[in-house]
Amino acid sequence: MPPTPMSPLDAWLHSHQAGGSLCMTFGLVARFVGEPPALDALRDRAAHRWAHHDRLRMSSGTGLRWIPGPPFDPVHHVGTPTRRASPDEHTAHLIARPFGPPRPPWQLHLLPGPDGGFALLLRAHHALLDGRSALVLVQELLDGPTALPGQRAGSQAPPRRRPGLTDLLPGGRPLPFHGPVDSRRAVAWSAVTAGELTAARDALPSGRASANAVFLAATAGALRGAGATGRLPFLPGVCAMVPVDVRPDDDGALLGNHYATVRVPLPSHGRARRRLAAVDRFTRRVALHERARAQARAVAGMAGRRGALTEALGRYVDSSLYSSLLCSSLADRGGPRTLGPAALTGLALLPSLSPGHPLAVTMVRDATGAATLTVVTDHARRVLAGRLSALLREEVRALGP
């Protein structure tokens, strides 16, 4: 297989790290209760279950091309840390470590934990995989039902280009936490039960809100509660950059970067249910999948057109004028999952940070309907990570009865 040019999205993500501005490593953590597997057994399992993925054999070298290689070496790509630390400490350390050539930029780490538990951390360069790809790989690694495809917009009508371009207009404002991103990471998470999330979704008299609407409304409230929206929190201009999956309807397990981002205004209302109502109205009114697919088509049309204009557009998308923070969500729609005798208890998505944006928030729902809310910041904002994580859980609970 000959080398292939990176897609425009892959190349843009690759350029962030190649230019020396940021580490573009992201991760997905799977937490378990039970006996951890032997390292050799985990390596054998990964080599067997992921052997069919050509994407895991790709390396980038020093250019903007994917270079195929032999089947991945499980001894290199699957390991466990040698130093003693908690799973949380290992996770924060590992997602701050950049990948470099010549090997494919991904690794799976077995992280021993206290009280008979453990975690797996799948981390990768964002140019190679996106969050959905990481979830697919973890689902394939574990034992359990086949994952159900995510809900996607119908494909009867071709996507329109205009909504995607409209979404590029300025809509954000600088916030107190914006600024240069340092080289270390802080991670904090909190858990929301299925009952709490269901009660929050049923909080509006107008009808059931989506789980994502609850997540975004909770983020708006947590930012306000932490003082992260400035001295005048009622001002507009706080926007979430929301990745939307644009994979074909019949290929939800496709690896790589197959998403586009859509901005969702985060309301400044002082009351939790008013914030949820505002987000719910926006997400119902705006065709998010159609807009995302239109934007994906526009980005794909830039292939081979790198120049001053595309570089300026990339810098703008990274700026606080475009969006305030990343808010990404995933859902594991399969049934209970296990790794040998150990049961999966939760998943957490740990995104890479973009230039000038030292804060990102994610939600991952499991098959029971429970969710893990995760905050990733750079080291300088580590206090904000812990504060927002606690506030996110409080905001979801506040929406219930």
Model-derived regions, located:
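Soluble acyl-CoA-dependent acyltransferase catalytic core bearing the H(X)4D motif
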Residues: M1-L9, V29-A51, R55-P355, V364-T368, ...
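Generic N-terminal amphipathic, Lys/Arg-enriched alpha-helix
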Residues: C23-V29
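Glycine-rich, small/acidic residue-mixed loop/short-helix segments
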Residues: G356-P358, R393-E394
